C-alpha cells in the first residue's frame, strides 16, 4: 500500500541532474562511456542507465526532464514495455536504446522448470536471444547494446549468463551492458528503489556522493520508481501504439 500511495519524484530527479551539473560532473549515457571510458576524464562522471521494467509512460516523463537538462542516457526496454511510440520518441531525442532481455528465465517459467534446469537451457536460450535481438533491431533500428533483466521467481538464475564470455558481435551487439562493465572500475554502482523501499539501494544518497566527488558513479534508474504510486495502476494501458507483447514476439 505504501508504494501505491507514494508521490511522484520528478522534482528529485531534476534536482539530481541540476546538482550534478553545478558540481562539475559530466553526465554521460552508459553507451557513451563504454565507447570511450577516458571521455571527460578531467571531470567527475555520472553515468546514467535506465531499465524500463514497468510503466513505459514514465520513461517519456524522465526523458523530458533529461532533455531540459541537456542530458542523454541509455535506455533498456523489456518486450512488455517496448511500446513503439515510447521507444521511437526516446530514440529520436538522441538517446541510445536496447533490449532488456529475460530470455532464460522466461523459457524456464514457460516450461514449468526451475533453477536446477537453467544450465541445460542456456544453449537454446542463446539462440532465442539472437533472434530476439534481431527482431528488436528490425523494429526499432540498429542497437549497440543489450542488458539482462532479472526475475525473483527464479533465485540464482541470471539472464546475463547468456552473453557472458560470448562474441557480442555474433548477436549484433557491441556490448552486453553488465558484462562490459566488468572490464572497468566503477567507484559507486547506484541503483534506485521506490519511495516505499527507501529511494536508493543500501540507503545511499546520490547527492552526498556527488558532494563527496565520488567518480565514476553508475546510476541504474528505473523510471517506474519515480512515477506516483497510483500511476502504476495504468501500467498496461495502451500508449503511443500497440504493445509489442507481454513476452517476446514470434520469431522465425
Where are these regions (language model features)?
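Extracellular glycan-modifying ectodomains
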Residues: 54
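Terminal accessory/targeting
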Residues: 1-48, 57-74, 80-94, 104-252
Amino acid at each position: 500500500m505504501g508504494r501505491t500511495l507514494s508521490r511522484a519524484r520528478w522534482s528529485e530527479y531534476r534536482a539530481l541532474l541540476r546538482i550534478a551539473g553545478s558540481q562539475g560532473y559530466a553526465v554521460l549515457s552508459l553507451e557513451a562511456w563504454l565507447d570511450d571510458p577516458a571521455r571527460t576524464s578531467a571531470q567527475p562522471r555520472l553515468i546514467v542507465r535506465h531499465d524500463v521494467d514497468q510503466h513505459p509512460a514514465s520513461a517519456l516523463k524522465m526523458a523530458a526532464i533529461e532533455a531540459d537538462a541537456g542530458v542523454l542516457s541509455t535506455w533498456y526496454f523489456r518486450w512488455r514495455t517496448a511500446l513503439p511510440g515510447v521507444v521511437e520518441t526516446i530514440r529520436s531525442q538522441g538517446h541510445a536504446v536496447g533490449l532488456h532481455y529475460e530470455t532464460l528465465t522466461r523459457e524456464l517459467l514457460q516450461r514449468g522448470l526451475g533453477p536446477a534446469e537453467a544450465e541445460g537451457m542456456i544453449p537454446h536460450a542463446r539462440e532465442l536471444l539472437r533472434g530476439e535481438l534481431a527482431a528488436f533491431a528490425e523494429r526499432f533500428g540498429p542497437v549497440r547494446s543489450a542488458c539482462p533483466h532479472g526475475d525473483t521467481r527464479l533465485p540464482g538464475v541470471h539472464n546475463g549468463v547468456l552473453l557472458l564470455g560470448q562474441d557480442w558481435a555474433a548477436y549484433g551487439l557491441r556490448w552486453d551492458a553488465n558484462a562490459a562493465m566488468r572490464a572497468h572500475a566503477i567507484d559507486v554502482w547506484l541503483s534506485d528503489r521506490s519511495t516505499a523501499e527507501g529511494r536508493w539501494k543500501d540507503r545511499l544518497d546520490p547527492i552526498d556522493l556527488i558532494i563527496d566527488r565520488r567518480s565514476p558513479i553508475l546510476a541504474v534508474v528505473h523510471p517506474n520508481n519515480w512515477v506516483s504510486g497510483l500511476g502504476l495502476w495504468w501500467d498496461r494501458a495502451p500508449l503511443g501504439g500497440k504493445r509489442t507483447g507481454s513476452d517476446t514476439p514470434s520469431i522465425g
